[in-house]
Amino acid sequence: ANLGAMLKRLDPRLSIQLYEASDGLAQESSDGWNNAGTGHAGICELSYTPKREADGSVKVAKVIEIFEQFEQSKQFWSYAVANDMASHPREFINPVPHISFVHGADQVEFLKARHAGMSAHHFFREMVFTTDRTTLASWAPLLVEGRGDGPIAATKMDGGTDVNFGAISRKLLSWLGRQEGCGIASGHRVIGLRRNSTGWEVRVKESATGLVRTNRAKFVFVGAGGGTLPLLQMSGIPEAKGLGGFPIGGQWLICDNPEIVEKHQAKVYGQPLAAAPTMAVPHLDTRILDGKKTLLFGPFAAWTTKFLHQQGRYTDLPFSIRPDNLSTLVNIGIHNLDLVRYLIQQGTQSMRNRIEVLKIFYPAAQAADWKLIDAGIRVQAIKKTDGQAGIVHYGTEVITDAACSISALLGASPGASVSVNIVLEVIRKCFPALLASPEGHARMKAMIPTFDLDIK
């Protein structure tokens, strides 16, 4: 959605066709119910600053990088609102404070060191640290309600957001579909990708009728979430050799009790649980979804072999295994047994056990106020790194062929939050001529004023 809209603004003469397997748009991991909507800015996610160094400090370079990238997303979306590409911004972004919360003496010292490192940078100058329960109760009363004695601490920054990535995606795609030379086709699955002398032949099957057609394109972008890896493998490009995918399912606890929901106005991230992947670090989130304020806790990870929540099949993982990635996937199983056991345990635990995890954040939680829902599926990119197979990559990665005729996005966190920065990477690499001209540069500056600046 972001790439199509940005390319069309850079060069209105471009013809752009989008295909979506689902009947609706942005129904998988982008949908508001299928992700945390944090607007990852590095403010509260402790997994980006996982440990203290030998001198007691905490490295904050990663959170600074993510914050800068998310600023680019907000700039582009602001441009979209101002230029009638996305109306009613409160339908997709709302201000919500971001809080990091820890308990235990060691973690309190860690958070204090994290705050010292982050608040020294101008991005996070407004961040506040406290160990005072009265102060914390004024920030997020559910965290203190019913809590026993013991060291606790939190940081808070009011500049955080809650983002409905599905809503902004659908708004941008709606605008794109109305532009000359552009089309949006949902209910269409790509079943073939073959290189030709001028670019690519894309075979597409319409789900409702079974009709198959072939389109030709000079450039193809694969941004299909968990469905990206099979399409990338289908392309046959050398850059896809050895790549694998490791799907991780997700579930939320959701509370619609208005009395409880109104007590909480923050996104609260906690400490990573043992063996948990980064996208499964627990958090208690205020969400604005479908015009309604609600409260989500999770995510709880789960074992799955599907690559997509709605359009996926249980054969996705086995069918993705090829001779060139078999050793990588085997090594994932061997060297990440704790992770595999964790996923199986998470997916089979009882509601009582889930509520016990929730009580780490909200000690007074009652099971009757919460229900379990399924969330999206994250497919982690797996590849060989430094000669060692079986490394799970929890970030996002753009794979581009040598001819710059096809790009694909793999990975998850921080994902949608830095989508505009990812789009910039694709444009710089695959469409350099669009930025080389004075006119193109000016158009990009209008969309993202800091795109060529280092604001760190």
Functional labels for PLM-detected ranges:
Residues 208-219:
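Core beta-strand elements of the Rossmann-like FAD/NAD(P) dinucleotide-binding domain
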Residues 87-96, 101-179, 183-185, 193-198, ...:
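Flavin (FAD/FMN) cofactor-binding and adjacent substrate-gating region
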Residues 8-32:
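Glycine-rich FAD pyrophosphate-binding loop
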Residues 222-238:
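Flavin (primarily FAD) binding-site architecture
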Residues 41-43, 239-267:
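Central beta-strand plus flanking loop segment that forms part of the substrate or channel wall
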Residues 37-138, 294, 304-306, 312-315:
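Dinucleotide-binding Rossmann-like beta1-alpha1 core, especially the glycine-rich loop
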Residues 150-159, 167, 309-436:
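C-terminal catalytic lobe of FAD-dependent flavoproteins
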Residues 61, 65-73, 102-109, 155-177, ...:
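Short beta-strand to alpha-helix junction loop
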